UniProtKB/Swiss-Prot annotation:
This is Nonribosomal peptide synthetase inpA. Nonribosomal peptide synthetase; part of the inp gene cluster that mediates the biosynthesis of fellutamide B, a mycotoxin that acts as a proteasome inhibitor. In the first step of fellutabmide B biosynthesis, inpC activates 3-hydroxydodecanoic acid to generate 3-hydroxydodecanoyl-AMP that is then loaded onto the T0 domain of inpB. The 3-hydroxydodecanoyl-S-phosphopantetheinyl-T0 is sequentially extended with L-Asn and L-Gln by the two CAT modules of inpB. The linear lipodipeptide from inpB is then transferred onto inpA for the addition of the third amino acid, L-Leu. Residues 1117-1436 are annotated as: Thioesterase (TE) domain. The lineage of its organism: Eukaryota, Fungi, Dikarya, Ascomycota, Pezizomycotina. The keyword Ligase applies. Belongs to the NRP synthetase family. InterPro entries: AA_adenyl_dom, ACP-like_sf, AMP-bd_C_sf, AMP-binding_CS, AMP-dep_synth/lig_dom, ANL_N_sf, CAT-like_dom_sf, Condensatn. Residues 1-24 are annotated as: Disordered. The modification O-(pantetheine 4'-phosphoryl)serine is found at S1041.
């Protein structure tokens, strides 16, 4: 009994304890909730979980202020009673708990809390001010999600999308109208009931399984529109509205929503060139299985990804049915929430990265459109709400009613989609909707016209604007100049000059021999292989006059490849230079060395008059082929005439043109360098192979070249100042590099030219390329017409702006491929259905992916296949993979891909193993022997084998062995995984490298070979430490032509030995072999001795004598402070560029010399000028300007004082270092800025020989006519920096006045910015900090717009500093005020134009007040320290009176523009764009 009682008592006690603990936990939770909501627990009415959508939207709003927070502005009708309206809203608020909801975080869970509250009404009489203040409120957890304000004329309801949707707005406003009329609000299901019904654990599991299955087949998902960078966050700031009517008679069984979504899928597919599209859509959620769900007030909507298969081969009916089925199937699974979907796996994460949100709303009939609350409220800003509401790059809202009215409201980020492009997208969407509605269901998707009628009209307009020119056949064009300008120079070569009449005479004699002795005529191809000379040009012209066609061969190509091409053209005669004759020994047919000696014995000139067909072959050029062998392109006289008629004027070619023959003869660019120059009546300038492969700048100068065509890779090694008379630079063969554009765009006429060999060299030209041009823009067609089609189906014409394959049409198309009808038919197509014509129209499929820009020009995006450009020449990856696979037949696979490192493009080869061939414990040699030939066991063996069958530029430079082949979800080779591995190597990948044991050590006595080894490895783009001191073949490094040219130039300057690049292409040439050729000239291959132009040689030698004399006369040793800053780095650069400066000692704040030097190199690398060749002329002394004796070592201090025993004395000091701190007082800066100057002058006073001291000043400057006393008085209230620089400068000035031994200079720069060319501004500089602050404030001080802003780029200031430092004479101290600059108004105009922002002008005082107010809330932000300094410094000015000699050099404004552009691109200068609404 007692046990029973005891047991009962214990149970009761336990239950009571549990209840107490539960109540305690509940109280704690309620207390936490109340704290987050800043209220009391008694005010909490209900708590329940958020939907995934609510949680996602709320999270986005926390990271993107303003997102998903809408301000609904209503105009009150005149009779509306304000008090009664407020009471009506109070009733509705109590009726619908969702309007009293807030969101809090309990652990990791987002919960919605319903409070017992009434709305807090604010006044919005000043509507604009209220909206601005309301919009600035930052959303936080526990904060109200709805706010209200009212005035006599307006009511504002601000609401977060987590508490309402479009249906809810209508229901709420209807209830407000009912309550205003004292009616009874009908009962509605609560949002809590919706959550309980829809979000169950069982459904969650089913939903996750559904989405995993739905995305399992995905390979990769592309987004539309594409973002400019992965870190870019879209900000929709523009709206486009459009309305039109369509005939509605759609397919039965398909909803209008289905048609709209299917149409958008086609739009997106057309712009991405993808058959798998993904975009987001917002579903109402009102189709779920719940009674009266259409009456729920709350956000029942759901955002989900839409995945559509847009294969062009399927029927329209099948596509529409599949689209409708997609939406039907996902109804039970629509509420998963994007944030939850992302977490499932890689595929589901990818489909959530969409940037287009497509929303369809059924259109309302006229009766449905009548508002039950319109007599009370009228919405005023609905469109603007939608524009700023979402965070996607594009939100496309569409309504389509049975009446045929289609309405579109698109909100978009205009930095990603322009307004004109947005219009085109809407027109295209409307056009596709119309076709889907009216089409026969059996029609294929490929038959749906994706381009709108408006786009077709625009293409025709662009075509009509093209200029047309006279077309002359090459021989006719050249003959015109022979007849009218016989004495004009046709060829200016290193070995002679030929006038047009002389060229014709020699060519006629050669043609006579070819016709009579070799039976040359139409369609007979003559290979021509020369080291560059005048006789090569004669040979080309001679073949043409004989009626034949020519094939230019590059002597450096592998012998196997040369012989293959000769065999392909069935050559019976080959024309060569004497130096190339040996390469063709044993080749069937006549080998003729064309030179002066031959013409001495062949004087007969008689060619029979014949009518020759215009479509006969003019020349052949071989390009890389995917089958392992090159393919020959046949260009006819007529096709080249059509091309030349357009590209010669586009390139600016005329009778005054002097064009350098620079391209490889194997590159079709060489054709227009030669034939184009002659056809326009210009001059072909022919350098020696040695000069062409060395430094080309002297060649350009000596030959007065005014037009040259280069790849960006090569142009990067030229400087404008080295070729001052060069007028036009055409960049060809590879994408235009941005850094090259910055250097050249404003220095001459810069051109971006594009054209496949199959279309006669040049097809499009962008002229001129400016600093603002898109480097990927290849211009407009110069011959024929361009079209953009679907990459997988040329029967589908794409709209303007869509990415697709470029098709070229016109008379300039080549005949086709030699002996390959199948490839010709695949590449040259006739009459796609969108190009109807009585006669078939012919098009060439380039394989290049492009899109039309808004002005009709073409923007290059890449390749649709594996073809790439290496050093300007086209390379089929498949051809390399073919030869690699033949070398390793036992491999599970082989692949080649492109790897970009800095400015270099490399080919990387991959070999894949299987379980049998891979063993991680084996050496690479063991694995290679299992995969292929036992004789190929090292990386160098592989390269040597490949170079026997392919040109040097096609041989990969890196090699990897993989344990297995990486595959995508679709089972294909995953090339992305290959590229990722290149930067992050795993244990299942072996990187091949030359092993040190494979190559012998170079004898320590062979100094030349060791020096070459060091130089060559320095040039290699990747570290090869295992080859240090080893004797290896040069070919294994995969050096490109520019690197080989550098070696040739080095050998010439270091050892005086002449060498050609062709020599270095020898596969077996080793380091010691190259050294032997230098030290023993007789070991070098014999070259034809060129004739010597004594006049030019004398000029060259005298220039060299003058340069050396000046250098010997002034051997300088300079001590420089502040070398790591923007200006200091530029000073150091110019010192090292001066041959008279033997050594520069840089004083750097660092713990040791190595770290100090690293800082110097880092600054110089950032400024894009550092070269390892400078290292031996720079010495780093670590120290601290603020310490006694500058913190130097005793011996270093003695050297600075000139009292050390050893070493050449220091001859100049440039004191550029200083401490710049915005708010530091004088005493804090004195040690660095003043005491360091005392130390340096103390050291200099001990020099026994005259020297120079230059002080770089700063801070406030004395106004013209201002006496010293008043200036010093004004400085008493200035900042510490200005005070310290003044004291230091005055100290220098007085030191100069008390001695006469040394030359003392003071340079006073204004604001120093980055150069126009490199545009590397110092973001810590006061000027840019001020601009940044003004942009964020939204205003700038504009008082005195005509005042002067002294600003110059670092290069200009450094030049002035060195000029005064090394001046031979002049007063001491000399003072150089760098007063070049621009007006204050012009400066701010440049800021506004370059950033695209509208900034408000203010007076100085008003701006200071605005800045003070703004900075008050930003005191912890470093950005506003300069602003605070300005506010606190009464002497700080926004500009000065324009000096008498103040004037901007031509590049100041350009430099400012360039700096601003860099600051915008890096995000340092950012804006907040306003919403712009555009309506039809």
């Amino acid at each position: 009994m007692s046990h029973s009682m005891s047991s009962s008592s214990s149970s009761s006690s336990s239950s009571s304890s549990s209840r107490d603990e539960g109540q305690s936990r509940l109280n704690n939770v309620l207390s936490n909730i109340a704290k987050q909501c800043r209220t009391t627990s008694a005010q909490v009415q209900d708590v329940y979980p958020c939907t995934p959508l609510q949680q996602g939207l709320f999270a986005l709003s926390l990271t993107s202020p303003g997102a998903y927070m809408a301000q609904h502005v209503f105009r009150l009708q005149p009779f509306v009673d304000q008090g009664r309206m407020k009471q009506a809203w109070n009733v509705v608020l109590q009726k619908h708990a969702i309007l009293r909801t807030r969101i809090v975080m309990l652990g990791e869970n987002a919960m919605q809390v319903v409070l017992k509250q009434s709305p807090e009404w604010r006044n919005c009489s000043d509507l604009r001010a209220y909206l601005d203040a309301d919009q600035s409120i930052t959303l936080q957890t526990g904060e109200p999600l709805t706010r209200w304000a009212i005035s006599d004329t307006h009511l504002v309801w601000s609401a977060h999308h987590s508490v309402y949707d479009g249906f809810s707005v209508e229901l709420i406003l209807r209830d407000v109208a009912t309550a205003y009329a004292d009616g009874e609000i009908p009962p509605r299901p609560s949002f809590r009931q919706f959550i309980q019904r829809m979000f169950q654990q069982k459904q969650k599991s089913l939903t996750e399984a559904y989405w995993k299955k739905k995305t399992a087949h995905l390979d990769e998902v592309d987004t539309f529109p594409r973002l400019p960078a992965s870190t870019y966050r879209p900000r929709p700031n523009s709206v486009y509205k459009h309305e039109s009517s369509l005939a509605i008679d759609g397919p039965s069984g398909v909803t209008l929503s289905t048609i709209a979504n299917a149409a958008w899928g086609l739009v997106q597919s057309s712009h991405l060139g993808s058959e798998q599209v993904s975009f987001g859509t917002t579903l109402s959620g009102r189709n779920a299985n719940m009674p009266d769900i259409d009456k729920v007030v709350g956000p029942t909507l759901a955002t989900v990804p839409v995945l559509l298969d847009v294969r062009s081969s399927q029927s329209v009916a099948d596509f529409l049915q599949a689209t409708q089925a997609y939406f039907t199937e996902l109804i039970p699974h629509q509420h998963i929430g994007l944030q939850n979907l992302r977490r499932l796996n890689r595929a589901t994460e990818a489909v959530c990265n969409f940037q287009t949100l497509f929303a369809f709303q059924p259109g309302m009939t006229e009766t449905q459109g009548q508002s039950p609350y319109g007599h009370l409220l009228t919405a005023e800003n609905k469109d603007k709400v939608e524009a700023a509401f979402y965070s996607y790059a594009l939100t496309f809202q569409c309504s389509l009613a049975g009446t045929g009215i289609i309405k579109v409201l698109a909100s978009y980020d205009d930095k990603i989609i322009s307004s004109s492009q947005m219009k085109r997208l809407v027109f295209q969407f409307e056009h596709i909707v119309s076709q889907l509605i009216s089409s026969n269901g059996s029609k294929r998707l490929s038959e749906i016209q994706l381009i709108s009628p408006q786009d077709l009209d625009q293409l025709d307009i662009w075509k009509r604007k093209m200029e047309s020119y006279e077309q002359l056949l090459p021989l006719d064009a050249i003959q015109r100049h022979i007849d009218t300008r016989p004495d004009a120079t046709a060829v200016a070569a290193w070995d002679g000059t030929l006038s047009y009449v002389e060229l014709d005479a020699f060519a006629t004699r050669l043609a006579t021999w070819l016709v009579h002795e070799q039976k040359v005529g139409p369609e007979i191809v003559i290979p021509i292989c020369f080291d560059r000379s005048q006789w090569m040009i004669v040979s080309i012209f001679g073949v043409l006059k004989a009626g034949g066609a020519f094939l230019l061969l590059d002597p450096i190509y592998p012998e196997n490849r040369l012989r293959y091409m000769i065999k392909m053209v069935n050559a019976r005669t080959i024309l060569v230079s004497e130096s190339c004759r040996a390469r063709f020994e044993g080749v069937p047919g006549a080998i003729l060395a064309v030179n002066a000696a031959w013409f001495e014995t062949h004087t007969h000139a008689s060619i029979p008059m014949r009518e020759l067909p215009v479509d006969r072959a003019l020349y052949l050029v071989f390009t890389s082929g995917s089958t392992g062998q090159p393919k020959g392109v046949i260009v006819t006289h007529a096709s080249y005439a059509a091309s030349a008629a357009g590209h010669m004027p586009a390139l600016g070619m005329n009778e005054n043109t002097r064009q350098l023959f620079f391209a490889s003869p194997a590159f079709d660019l060489s054709i227009y360098e030669i034939l184009g120059s002659l056809m326009c009546g210009g001059t072909v300038c022919v350098p020696t192979e040695e000069d062409r492969n060395g430094s080309v700048a002297p060649v350009i100068r000596d030959m007065n070249v005014n037009l040259i065509s280069l790849t960006s890779s090569y142009a990067r090694h030229l400087r404008p100042e080295d070729v001052p008379r060069l007028e036009t630079l055409a960049l060809v063969g590879e994408p235009l590099a941005r850094d090259v554009q910055r250097v050249w765009a404003n220095r001459l006429t810069l051109i971006n030219a594009y054209g496949p060999a199959e279309c006669s060299v040049v097809s499009t030209v962008k002229r001129p390329v400016t600093l603002d041009s898109n480097p990927a823009n290849i211009g407009t067609t110069v011959a024929g017409r361009a079209w953009v089609v679907h990459p997988k189906d040329h029967e589908i014409l794409l709209p303007i702006g869509a990415t697709g394959e470029l098709l070229l049409e016109g008379d300039h198309l080549a005949r086709g491929y030699l002996n390959d009808e199948e490839k010709t038919a695949a590449a040259y197509i006739f009459g796609p259905y969108w190009a109807p014509s009585p006669t078939p129209r012919r098009f060439y499929k380039t394989g290049d992916l492009v899109h039309f820009d808004e002005d009709g020009s073409i923007v290059f995006e890449g390749r649709k296949d594996s073809q790439v450009k290496i050093r300007g020449q086209r390379v089929e990856i498949a051809e390399i993979e073919h030869h690699l696979a033949r070398l390793f037949p036992n491999a599970a696979g082989a692949a080649v891909d492109v790897f970009k490192h800095e400015y270099h493009v490399h080919l990387v080869a991959f070999l894949f193993c299987d379980k049998e061939s891979w063993n991680s414990s084996d050496t690479p040699a063991d694995i290679l022997q299992r995969l292929g030939d036992v004789n190929v066991s090292t990386m160098s063996h592989i390269k040597q084998q490949l170079e026997q069958v392919m040109p040097h530029h096609m041989v990969p430079t890196r090699y990897q062995i993989w344990a297995r082949m990486p595959t995508s979800l679709a089972g294909k080779l995953d090339r992305k995984a290959l590229r990722k591995e290149l930067g992050n190597q795993s244990t299942t990948v072996i990187e091949l490298d030359e092993t040190s044991t494979e190559f012998p050590v170079i004898d320590s006595t062979n100094k030349v070979a060791l020096r070459l080894n060091h130089k060559i490895l320095d040039l290699a783009s990747e570290e090869k430490t295992t080859l240090d001191g080893r004797d290896f073949p040069l070919s294994i490094l995969g050096l490109d032509s520019i690197q080989l040219i550098t070696i040739v130039t080095f050998i010439r300057s270091e050892y005086g030995a002449k060498m050609t690049v062709e020599t270095l292409y020898d596969l077996k040439l080793t380091v010691t072999g190259l050294a032997a050729m230098i030290t023993s000239p007789h070991d070098r291959p014999a070259e034809a001795a060129p004739t010597l132009d004594l006049s030019k040689e004398l000029q060259r030698v005298y220039r060299e004598l003058t340069r050396r004399s000046e250098s010997i006369k002034h051997k300088r040793k300079v001590f420089l402070t502040g070398a790591t800053g923007l200006l200091g780095s530029q000073i150091l650069r110019q010192l090292l560029a001066d041959p008279s400066v033997q050594r520069v000692i840089v004083h750097v704040r660092a713990n040791d010399a190595a770290k100090g030097m690293a800082r110097v190199v880092s600054a110089a690398t950032l400024a894009k000028w550092w070269s390892s060749s400078y290292a031996n002329r720079v010495e780093c002394w670590p120290g601290d300007l603020g310490m006694p004796q500058l913190g130097l070592q005793p011996e270093q201090w003695r050297m600075l004082c000139g009292t050390a025993d050893a070493g050449a004395p220091i001859t100049s000091v440039i004191h550029n270092g200083a401490a710049v701190q915005w708010q530091a007082p004088y005493q804090a800066l004195k040690a660095v800025n003043v005491d360091s100057t005392v130390e340096l002058l103390t050291a200099m006073a001990q020099w026994s020989e005259p020297g120079s001291f230059t002080f770089v000043s700063g801070g406030l400057k004395r106004s013209p006519g201002q006496d010293l006393e008043s200036f010093m008085k004004s400085l008493e209230q200035a900042n510490g920096y200005s005070q310290s620089k003044f004291v230091a400068e005055e100290l220098v000035s007085r030191f100069a006045g008390h001695q006469s031994t040394h030359r003392v200079s003071i340079v006073r720069p204004g604001w120093v910015i980055g150069t126009e060319k490199d545009a590397v501004p110092n973001t810590d500089d006061f000027l840019w900090k001020l601009v940044q602050a003004c942009i964020q404030i939204g205003a700038y001080p504009a008082e005195g717009g005509d005042l002067w802003l002294a600003v110059a780029d670092a290069e200009e200031v450094a030049t002035r500093i060195l000029a005064t430092t090394f001046a031979a004479s002049g007063e001491s101290p000399s003072v150089d005020n760098v007063e070049i600059g621009t007006t204050v108004s012009r400066f701010w105009e440049l800021i506004k134009v370059q950033t695209g922002m509208e900034l408000t002008q203010m007076s100085a005082e008003d701006w200071k007040q605005a800045a003070q107010d703004f900075a008050a809330s930003q005191e912890s932000e470093q950005t506003f320290l300069p602003v605070l300094a300005m506010l606190q410094d009464p002497q700080m000015e926004f500009g000065v009176q324009r000096p008498a000699n103040g004037g901007p050099p031509s590049n100041v404004n350009a430099a400012i523009r360039s700096n601003i552009k860099t600051l915008v691109e890096t995000g340092f200068l950012s804006d907040s764009s306003e919403v712009v609404i555009v309506e039809d």
